[in-house]
Amino acid sequence: MVINKVEICGVNTSKLPVLKEKEMRELLISMRNGNTTAREKFIKGNLRLVLSVIQRFNNRGENADDLFQVGCIGLIKSIDNFDLSQNVKFSTYAVPMIIGEIRRYLRDNNSIRVSRSLRDIAYRALQVRDRLISKNNKEPTVSQIAKELKIPREEVIFALDAIQDPISLFEPIYHDDGDAIYVMDQISDNKNLDDSWLQNISIKEAMKKLSDREKMILNMRFFDGRTQMEVADEIGISQAQVSRLEKTALKHMKKYV
């Protein structure tokens, strides 16, 4: 059977059920009470979610059946770990876990590992790219980025290719005795980045769980690009307080992103 050019052996997508939010919640409650029939129905009712996710990996030359099986593992993990007490849609919670499971599978089955030095070059290249865009109001060429970094053009291309798989916004890329620097700090919002749609949905849902002060601090830090000291001056607290509030907010958000 074919769904948007993804072939899955043994899956008749035309007969896959579609569950409404209310029905999903009722099934989840029933599952928590040990109802195995409800669990099976819930899994079948969310297989379309897995199919929609694996379409994003179409161009990698991977076997769609394998990706589907791995995606189903991610779906089941999502079901087992989903917290009904949180006001979050199941799909919002499940999609990142399904994608994460597929990425782990791809990493584990890829003989090429991305070295620390390559990642460092890639992050520096992304920083330079953002700076040049801000300065010139247009996308820089790879040659321009390489010139800024004073390294060969081919090295920049190789490094950026090596981190093609999207990286978590909360992945620390540097930390000293002070605050960690996250990818979110270094890369501006870009609609063309892979999975930007997913990050946008997840971040919006996660931000709803924060206090007004936490929202304001994260908006100023990561969307307005201000330093912790600038935020502290703006809202009238110390830099240390900003740091603590920021870390607490990020910790809360990581539960949902």
Curated annotation (Swiss-Prot):
Motif (Polymerase core binding): 66-79
Record flagged with keyword Transcription regulation: yes
Pfam families reported for this sequence: Sigma70_r2, Sigma70_r3, Sigma70_r4
Membrane spanning residue stretches: none
Matches recorded under CDD domains: Sigma70_r4
Domain of life (superkingdom): Bacteria
SUPFAM superfamilies documented for this protein: Sigma2 domain of RNA polymerase sigma factors, Sigma3 and sigma4 domains of RNA polymerase sigma factors
Role this protein plays: Sigma factors are initiation factors that promote the attachment of RNA polymerase to specific initiation sites and are then released. This sigma factor is responsible for the expression of sporulation specific genes.
Family to which this protein belongs: Belongs to the sigma-70 factor family.
Protein name per Swiss-Prot or TrEMBL: RNA polymerase sigma-G factor
Source organism (scientific name): Clostridium acetobutylicum (strain ATCC 824 / DSM 792 / JCM 1419 / IAM 19013 / LMG 5710 / NBRC 13948 / NRRL B-527 / VKM B-1787 / 2291 / W)
Native organism taxonomy: Bacteria, Bacillati, Bacillota, Clostridia, Eubacteriales
Name of encoding gene: sigG
